[in-house]
Amino acid sequence: MKLIIFTGLVLFAIVSLIEAQAENEKACLPQYQVCTDAPGNCCSNVVCDCYGRYKSGARIGRNCFCLQKGVIYKREN
């Protein structure tokens, strides 16, 4: 009887641990995906980089994308 109770408790602990780990592993956004509404959801190898959009000198919005860490993007004419 004690063995059955012990086995049940061990199985319960294992299932609880697996469920807790699954909750912590949220889907992340890969490179070049839009992260404007979720800046903390980019995968670990990329960072959410935001850029302001301007028209005639007035700011009209911003765009955020998951981009490689440490990479500098420059506009080409």
From Swiss-Prot:
Belongs to the neurotoxin 19 (CSTX) family. 08 (U8-Lctx) subfamily. Keywords: Disulfide bond, Secreted, Signal, Toxin. Residues 1-20 form the signal peptide. This is U8-lycotoxin-Ls1d. It comes from the Eukaryota. GO terms for molecular function: toxin activity. It holds the Pfam family Toxin_35. Expressed by the venom gland. Contains 4 disulfide bonds.
